[in-house]
Amino acid sequence: MPELYIITGSNGAGKSSLGGYFLPINIREKCVVFDGDKLFIDKQREIWKSGITAIKEAKKIAIAFVNDTFNSLIEEAISKKNDFAYEGHFTNDATWDIPKKFKSNDYNIHLIFLGLTNPKISQTRVGERVKVGGHYVDPKTVKANFYGNLEKLDKYFSIFDTLKIMDTSVSEFLEVCNLENGEVVSSVENYLLPKWFVENLPYISQIISAKSNLKT
């Protein structure tokens, strides 16, 4: 079966810089991970250079271009049964239509989630990224993405064939858990679960706790 890999998580958690390392080698070799944020920035700069300097107009054109490109790539991948990989945020129910679409077309779907301790760290990481030429995200959006991604993950996690959740708050990343079809395959001990994980992923935490209790 063809494979879909999705990389998501908090702003500044390393989706673009680190996410690819968590992909299987065969996917890294075959797929270019679609990065809508990067494509948007590149397109917006291209639009400005073309002479359109109105910020709202340039943004509107760039967003439309990204959406059209993404949708075209999705349709092409599904029609050819090609593997596909992309990164993004999943803060509302509509954003989950894409994984469901691949699932309904007989894809194995996989999610890699990169989490951080809190929105403050997320915003700090974004600030550091901007200093070296990366894209800016305003604090309101950072906070909405931080909590929105977690809320929807706890709701929809069972649709994935595999789910890997990492804590990338510090340089030594913590592989928090791995799930297959909604069931825990591996996880850290309960006392090692990060606070952000327990507080914002209550259902997944409950499943991990239940499995841990069965071992004792």
Enumerate the language-model features and the residues they cover.
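The Walker A (P-loop) glycine that initiates the GxxxxGKT/S ATP-binding motif of P-loop NTPases
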Residues: 9
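Walker A (P-loop) phosphate-binding loop of P-loop NTPases
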Residues: 12
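Conserved lysine of the Walker
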Residues: 15
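Conserved substrate/cofactor phosphate-moiety recognition/catalytic segment
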Residues: 20-80
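Glycine-rich phosphate-binding loop used to anchor ATP phosphates in small-molecule kinases
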Residues: 61-113, 149
